[in-house]
Curated annotation (Swiss-Prot):
Gene name of the record: FAM240C
Biased composition (Basic and acidic residues): 76-95
Organism: Homo sapiens
Domain of life: Eukaryota
Name of the protein: Protein FAM240C
Region (Disordered): 68-95
InterPro entries: FAM240
Similarity field: Belongs to the FAM240 family.
PANTHER family xrefs: PROTEIN FAM240B, PROTEIN FAM240C
Length: 95
């Protein structure tokens, strides 16, 4: 009870200051939130423009293809290794 009476007495002594402070605090945080939202938006645009993600995807595709090739032709029927193709074409020419 003492705390409530104390805060009421402070509010009643300076009512203009409390209203001004709450408005100033509200404005301060609104600016902070707006600035943060703008910063997040700019960061998102920067990341989208970055080539790093494209490079990662390209390297992942290359590694996946290399792994499939190393596993052998029996495990990857959709792609014939380049060395096998060249051998078959030479055989056809010789025959």
């Amino acid at each position: 009870m003492v705390g409530k009476n104390m805060s009421k007495s402070l509010t009643l002594k300076n009512p203009g200051r409390v209203a001004y402070d709450s408005g100033g605090i509200k404005m301060f945080w609104e600016k902070k939130i707006e600035h943060h939202a703008r910063h997040l938006q700019n960061e998102d645009i920067r990341v989208r423009r970055s080539a790093l993600n494209k490079l990662r995807v390209g390297w992942a595709e290359q590694l996946e293809g290399r792994n499939k090739m190393l596993q052998g032709p029996g495990r990857c029927p959709d792609r014939v290794p380049e060395a096998t193709e060249s051998l078959h074409t030479k055989d056809k020419k010789a025959a």
